[in-house]
């Protein structure tokens, strides 16, 4: 078509600071011919674990020493602003992803497009995560770990030996945000033991959202599950019980 605009391809490694994206970045940097790289981007979220910032700083130092741009992009609205508008995110209304995290991605795409470029993202999904990397969400994406036939269990074994992760991968397989509504109890116990102030804050906010919804609709509600029995109050009690059991085992 005469009016069709041809965009120039650019290649950006999208890193979260979790185990897979860090391992992927190492693969990319060690194979510059196979994986051309215009820059590295980190979506800078308030809800990230403190150790993630330490990992990102290590990445940034290595990348900048190679003369490669490293961008940190924040969402245009803060987590608290969106919380005040939508309430606590849950398993159905995942604004923490679409309205928060993915806004960072949209900003990079808009910026590159304004220069006549089409962004291709390197994403840290492993070869045994087929359902995820075939998701239509990952349009214009490249998966180096898939190309290199690297399984998640191999990276998990590596991550458990990295002190910078503050024992996270000794108890968990994947890293998300501290207050994630999809988190299982194992992750919540880790949060309770290692990041208690943050855990307290997110539980308080979840309680407030549940109370508002219950008052509005006149029936019990749970952020975490479809059954309102398993609400935040129940979750807090269960996490405290499991955390005390774990501390008892550690102290034996």
Where are these regions (language model features)?
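Nucleotide-activated chemistry modules centered on ATP-dependent adenylation/adenylyltransferase
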Residues: 1-252
